[in-house]
Design a protein with these regions (language model features):
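Membrane-water interface of alpha-helical transmembrane segments
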Residues: 3, 29-32, 147
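Membrane-interface helix termini and inter-helical loops of multi-pass transporters
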Residues: 56-66
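A membrane-cytosol interface segment of integral membrane proteins
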Residues: 223-254
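Membrane-interface helix-loop junction between the first two transmembrane segments
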Residues: 15-34
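Membrane-embedded catalytic scaffold of the fatty acid hydroxylase/desaturase
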Residues: 41-50, 68-226
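Structural signature of hydrophobic alpha-helical transmembrane segments
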Residues: 1-15
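Membrane-interfacial loop-to-helix junctions in multi-pass inner-membrane proteins
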Residues: 29-34, 64-72, 76
């Protein structure tokens, strides 16, 4: 079910980005989209194994949360996982050896709903596993409804596709101004993918942007970035396993 929903969100935002593009000119299915989808398919089995394995084997957490009503279970689980993802993403940009792997994601020179699938396997492992481990260590979720954790993870998947989408949004619309008070969007996340290294190290939040505002990592500009990608002089080819990163030393972020 998770794979079906993820695919549905990506198709929706791909089509919207093609029909109402923020940056026009890219065909609906291009080389980057096909590469990202292939890479995501290769990592899907690993994702399922991680989720099932980690959630099944972790001991009960420090904070008893099993008696919470379902709506509170979703809220607490969502906030904790999103907060953990913010800090893992922050480390990806601040720790040089993590950036070596994370820059595969930033190698995309155009944005679309599949860009979130463009990940080195090492980057994928730590970004997926660490938040789940922290979640399991902090919260005792025995007694939680079985649909709560898939729901929380599903929100993250949908927002990941949305924030990378090449969709032109009406920045002045009333509903978008309300949305932008707390939630991520392509307008906000675009600056995280700028080729300008001085502006790229910010906007780390996945679903909520309140973490960036709280910890002063928010980057906002009136116009969209002039270019996306990395500018270290080492062009990253569409290599699903990105073995060249294990042979070359990438420049540190920023």
């Amino acid at each position: 079910m998770s794979a079906v929903l993820q695919g549905a969100w990506m198709v929706l935002f791909l089509v919207l980005g093609w029909r109402y593009p923020r940056v026009p000119g890219a065909p609906l299915l291009n080389r980057d989209v096909l590469f990202n989808l292939a890479n995501g398919a290769a990592l899907f089995g690993l994702r399922v194994t991680l989720i099932v394995g980690i959630t099944a084997r972790l001991p009960g957490g420090l904070v008893p949360a099993g008696a919470l009503p379902p709506w509170a279970q979703v809220l607490v689980g969502f906030l904790l996982l999103d907060f953990a993802r913010y800090w893992v993403h922050y480390a990806d940009h601040r720790v040089p050896w993590l950036w070596i792997f994370h820059r595969v994601h930033h190698s995309a020179e155009r944005m679309d709903a599949t860009t979130g699938l463009r990940m080195h396997v090492v980057d994928f492992l730590q970004l997926s596993a660490i938040p789940l481990v922290l979640f399991g260590l902090l919260l005792d979720t025995s007694g939680w409804a079985p649909w709560v954790i898939p729901t929380v993870l599903g929100v993250g998947v949908a927002m990941d596709a949305f924030q990378h989408a090449n969709v032109q949004l009406p920045a002045g619309a009333w509903w978008f101004r309300i949305w932008n008070l707390a939630l991520n969007s392509p307008n906000f996340h675009a600056w995280h993918h700028t080729s300008d290294g001085h502006l790229r190290d910010g906007n780390y939040g996945n679903t909520l942007i309140i973490w960036d505002r709280l910890f002063r990592t928010e980057v906002t500009q009136a116009e969209p970035p002039a270019a996306y990608g990395v500018t270290t002089g080492e062009a990253l080819r569409n290599d699903p396993l990105s073995w060249q990163l294990l042979r070359k030393r990438a420049a540190p972020p920023g």
